């Protein structure tokens, strides 16, 4: 499962870590792979120019999948690193972390379009750092309700 975001500081690594923790608490065998090779501890995945060593990554991923129930790949932001798209092609599924008021709708749409171009592999988005006031109307009971649907980055109420 590839976990990515549109921009930095959207909580991508925190979501990946918490997902790995939750799965391991269910007694699943989980490997959390830091594939953000711009950071020092993952630099062995990149060549001198800073590009992903695809063959090494693919072999690593194959081996990890054989030994674990889940492999969670924490990647650089999707639109800021071309190698993330290549990693998404190798992953079985992807999850996009979106922090409230961070990415512009056009950037979110671009990232989702690229992820969705890989087939049915994109599981959806994690809406992170949401303000409680935004969620409160959706948590109440009664006759008043709203449907939120449409193109990414917009919603329509009915």
Q: Where are the regions a protein language model picked out?
A:
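Switch II (G3) loop of P-loop NTPases
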Residues: 33, 48-84
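Walker A/P-loop NTP-binding active-site region of P-loop NTPases
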Residues: 1-47, 84
């Amino acid at each position: 499962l590839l976990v990515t975001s549109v921009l930095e500081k959207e909580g991508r690594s925190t979501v990946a870590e918490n997902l790995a923790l939750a799965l391991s608490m269910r007694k699943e065998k989980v490997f959390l792979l830091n594939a953000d090779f711009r950071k020092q501890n993952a630099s062995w995945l990149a060549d001198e120019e800073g590009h992903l060593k695809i063959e090494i990554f693919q072999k690593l991923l194959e081996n990890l999948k054989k030994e674990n129930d889940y492999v969670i790949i924490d990647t650089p932001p999707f639109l800021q690193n071309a190698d993330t798209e290549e990693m998404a092609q190798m992953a079985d599924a992807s999850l996009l972390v979106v922090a409230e008021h961070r990415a512009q709708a056009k950037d979110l749409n671009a990232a989702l379009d690229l992820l969705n171009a890989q087939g049915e592999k994109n599981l959806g988005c994690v809406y992170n750092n949401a303000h409680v006031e935004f969620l409160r109307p959706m948590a109440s009971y009664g006759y008043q309700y709203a449907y939120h649907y449409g193109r990414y980055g917009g919603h329509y109420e009915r």
